[in-house]
Amino acid sequence: MDNYPKLEEMMLLSNGAPQFLGAAGTPEGSGGNNSSSSSSSSSGGGGGGGSNSGSSAFNPQGEPSEQPYEHLTTESFSDIALNNEKALVETSYPSQTTRLPPITYTGRFSLEPAPNSGNTLWPEPLFSLVSGLVSMTNPPTSSSSAPSPAASSSSSASQSPPLSCAVPSNDSSPIYSAAPTFPTPNTDIFPEPQSQAFPGSAGTALQYPPPAYPATKGGFQVPMIPDYLFPQQQGDLSLGTPDQKPFQGLENRTQQPSLTPLSTIKAFATQSGSQDLKALNNTYQSQLIKPSRMRKYPNRPSKTPPHERPYACPVESCDRRFSRSDELTRHIRIHTGQKPFQCRICMRNFSRSDHLTTHIRTHTGEKPFACDICGRKFARSDERKRHTKIHLRQKDKKADKSVVASSAASSLSSYPSPVATSYPSPATTSFPSPVPTSYSSPGSSTYPSPAHSGFPSPSVATTYASVPPAFPAQVSTFQSAGVSNSFSTSTGLSDMTATFSPRTIEIC
């Protein structure tokens, strides 16, 4: 409030000088400077009823003195009100030419509200200065669900001790223009919370109404979650409302046997003792998921003798024995149904690692096994082995076909072919046939020519004598009609031989 003397001086210069000049009496002295001071009284509690007035008198030398107030009238004072907040009565300096009596002025606070707040007595800088100093004595109550920074600042200002100026509650927006308030905040900017997780304490009062929907009665709402997600949870949870079903206990659930522990497998592998074997056998009997399958050939003896297969299956209904502990481990997974190897691509589980390896090749397309005969590739070695058997069967079939063909050829070679005998027959019958007929025919004696005597020569006789033994078979085999035909046609040939000379016969 240190700025009020300056405000009063400005008001003295503007409004109060004519009034005090008219109200002054006879001059008592001339010259001298009168200094004015302000006296203000503050009313506690934000301004109470009534008015407080203070007065002070000064002599021309500036020293205070006791002077009566009868020479001042009430008409000489002017009430100045700013927004119904403060009314000041200011006095002006007396004339500088005459000596005035001691000046007395009073300041008064008016508590009467004005119908309008458009008072323009004070300039704008003073108005903004006062608006920054005055705080609201009784802030309006507004329902809001979320506090804002501006609202929190106004609430902190309301807790400060109020000033002497009284502010009406009906028109306070011009004064508080520097710090705007939000009586009804927008729900888009300040959304309401969905629910109250914890109710407020009994001592704290809510400054906003509760939400329209009722709050939860039984505490937090426990959602219905499947039982298999809480394998270790006990069945004593009672946080939900009565209409909700509590979690099922472990007693009501089916006991699923666990997978084969590694310690159990090692105990079987090391053959710790007969008592341990009996106890572990009982545990295995209780943990079986599916019944043990019987052997395909139970009476068939194994290739390895029993003393070389120390690892026996602990299941009573299974008499399998193994020479290696890892083989027993894989076999036990058949009884327990354990599949510890999982494909990361299709999430399929396998009981053996080699099965997983071959399965992954179906995703990658890898085929490392190739056929040695045709070059075809396979992802598994057993597939290549099965394919190789196809080539072996084809080879056996080809061998069988070759044997059949050779046997058929040998059987055909034992019988003479008619084609082979057909070719020498005309040659044998055509050439030697005219010779004997020429000698055996009765017409041979009818040739008394001296050339006839040339036939029994040793050279001719020996040549003709050697001809019949060279072809005995052909002559004997062809005692057919063809021969008879040759003889039947020999009549014409005999006529031709009659014309032949002995020299042509020798050439033949």
From Swiss-Prot:
InterPro entries: EGR1_C, EGR_N, Znf_C2H2_sf, Znf_C2H2_type. PROSITE patterns: ZINC_FINGER_C2H2_1, ZINC_FINGER_C2H2_2. The record marks R309, R320, R324, R330, R348, R352, R376, R380, R386 as: Interaction with DNA. Gene3D superfamilies: Classic Zinc Finger (3.30.160.60). Residues 413-468 are annotated as: 7 X 8 AA tandem repeats of [TS](2)-[FY]-[PS]-S-P-[GSAV]-X. Residues 386-396 have a biased composition (Basic residues). GO terms for molecular function: DNA binding; DNA-binding transcription activator activity, RNA polymerase II-specific; DNA-binding transcription factor activity; DNA-binding transcription factor activity, RNA polymerase II-specific; double-stranded DNA binding; double-stranded methylated DNA binding; enzyme binding; hemi-methylated DNA-binding. One of its GO terms (cellular component) is nucleus. A zinc finger (C2H2-type) spans 311-335, 341-363, 369-391. Induction: By growth factors. Rapidly and transiently up-regulated in response to ischemia. Residues 33-42, 139-164, 402-450 have a biased composition (Low complexity). GO terms for biological process: BMP signaling pathway; cellular response to antibiotic; cellular response to cAMP; cellular response to follicle-stimulating hormone stimulus; cellular response to gamma radiation; cellular response to gonadotropin stimulus; cellular response to growth factor stimulus; cellular response to heparin. Interacts with SNAI1 and SP1 upon 12-O-tetradecanoylphorbol-13-acetate (TPA) induction. Binds to DNA motifs with the sequence 5'-GCG(T/G)GGGCG-3' via its C2H2-type zinc fingers. The first, most N-terminal zinc finger binds to the 3'-GCG motif, the middle zinc finger interacts with the central TGG motif, and the C-terminal zinc finger binds to the 5'-GCG motif. Binds double-stranded target DNA, irrespective of the cytosine methylation status. Has reduced affinity for target DNA where the cytosines have been oxidized to 5-hydroxymethylcytosine. Does not bind target DNA where the cytosines have been oxidized to 5-formylcytosine or 5-carboxylcytosine. Transcriptional regulator. Recognizes and binds to the DNA sequence 5'-GCG(T/G)GGGCG-3'(EGR-site) in the promoter region of target genes. Binds double-stranded target DNA, irrespective of the cytosine methylation status. Regulates the transcription of numerous target genes, and thereby plays an important role in regulating the response to growth factors, DNA damage, and ischemia. Plays a role in the regulation of cell survival, proliferation and cell death. Activates expression of p53/TP53 and TGFB1, and thereby helps prevent tumor formation. This is Early growth response protein 1. It comes from Rattus norvegicus. The gene is Egr1.
